[in-house]
Amino acid sequence: MKLRLAYAAALVLAAAVSIAPGLSGAKPKGAGAPAPPPATPPTDADFRTPDPKDLLVIETTKGKVLVELNDIAAPMAAERVRTLARQGVYNGRGFFRVIDNFMDQTGDPLDTGMGQSSLPNLQPEFTFKRGSDTPFALVFKSNGAEEGYVGSLPVVSQSMDLGLLTVDHRVDAWGTYCAGVLGIARADDPASGNSQFFLMRTNATSPDGGSHGLDKQYTAFGRVLAGQDVIDAIKTGEPVAQPQDKMLSVKVVADMPEASRPHVRVVDASSPWGRAAIIRAEAASNPVDFTVCDVKLPVEVK
């Protein structure tokens, strides 16, 4: 099943880091931020350690990619990809549809876009419910929306102020398609996703300069922590001519022998270093155009 292209100029609010309330998130977008002092190295207290069951190591013909799955935003999709990785379904799968300035598509047992696994199709997880107990790190508020991070996934959310008006005190939130975000590919039927997925390339804009309009149309279930340069180097084509680049193997880190596991730490967006990084990025950008995709937080892999 083929991922539909959405080249309409829909607004895609992109997220890449997070911040605790009370920093730049307290100001309306465009208000700007004073430049903080130059960055010092993050301390151990600024890092978080992802759960090994949520980490995938994808060995490709172009290099290694490290991905963090997100069970809060898309639990069914994350578990499906984890399951298929453990079954070996993704080993040897080609990147059969790769569009520069957009995405790399893979995960089809037929390597054509027309195949799927033997498991049932997935129900869409285009949005999820965010409550006061959701670990959402706020980046900023703009036009009644809040942008931030849930784990490493960039997220856009309705304002939690609206939670006062809902029965369960929760609001809608959704993963937003910054560079490195992973989404479940599907056909026109929203419930047609199965095994295929795509990874966003760095400059994910349409030929006319607009956004691809993927938010709330495709299930976002994870993000690249390391290896974005590999994603950007995958051979392009629609379809990709042979020989295609491939995923040689896809492994869940929790299943790997301890001696061969990568040890991963990510700067926590709500840490002092993370909050300062947000302010630095906002100060260095055009305040009107600033998005959380403009902020890069360190990932340490050993």
Give residue ranges: language-model regions.
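Bacterial N-terminal signal peptides
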Residues: A8-S18
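Bacterial N-terminal signal peptides that target proteins for export
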Residues: M1-A9
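Cyclophilin-like peptidyl-prolyl cis-trans isomerases
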Residues: P21-K302
